[in-house]
């Protein structure tokens, strides 16, 4: 039973990582260096923690980018 739960958790984790990678591709950043992407995400995290209007602005941009296929 524990093995099955571990396997399910790993599958879920893998699926989530694949989906997050898809966001990088959708944003047109597939060929950027990983250090740049990580730096951008760290900076974004800091900005989101300190500025709620930035969060709202980026949600609007993301919703537009997803169009009808978004979340």
Curated annotation (Swiss-Prot):
It comes from the Bacteria. Keywords: Conjugation, Plasmid. Pfam families: TraD. InterPro entries: Conjugal_tfr_TraD_a-type. Belongs to the TraD family. This is Probable conjugal transfer protein TraD. It comes from Sinorhizobium fredii (strain NBRC 101917 / NGR234).
